[in-house]
Amino acid sequence: MKNYMIKYILADDEQQKEIEFSVQCESLDKAVEALVAELGKNYNPANVDFTTIVEDGNDIGEDGIYDAEISLAKYYN
């Protein structure tokens, strides 16, 4: 199991406040799945803008954000 901390901004949030979501799971794909579940079925995942992703204490950078965006794309309407 890995510890993930995902920071993101919701595109439809007027204040553009960064939100932090933490989860423990086996992969980044599963972490994104947990984030989508947290946001709820009625929320459009296309409005999620990742800013930082940390895996086991290490920022996984732009490559990690790109991988998370690919995982998130599975949930687009």
Where are these regions (language model features)?
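A structural detector for beta-sheet-dominated domains
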Residues: 9, 24-26, 51, 73
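A short, exposed loop/beta-hairpin motif centered on an aromatic-Gly-Thr core
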Residues: 16-28
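Short intrinsically disordered coil segments
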Residues: 21-22, 37-40, 69
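Short aromatic-glycine-(Arg/Gly/Cys) micro-motifs in beta-strand/loop hairpins
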Residues: 1-16
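Short, mixed-charge low-complexity intrinsically disordered segments
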Residues: 41-77
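A short, charged, amphipathic alpha-helix used as a generic interaction element across diverse proteins
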Residues: 26-47
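Hydrophobic residues positioned within well-ordered beta-strands of beta-sheet architectures
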Residues: 4-6, 19-21, 68
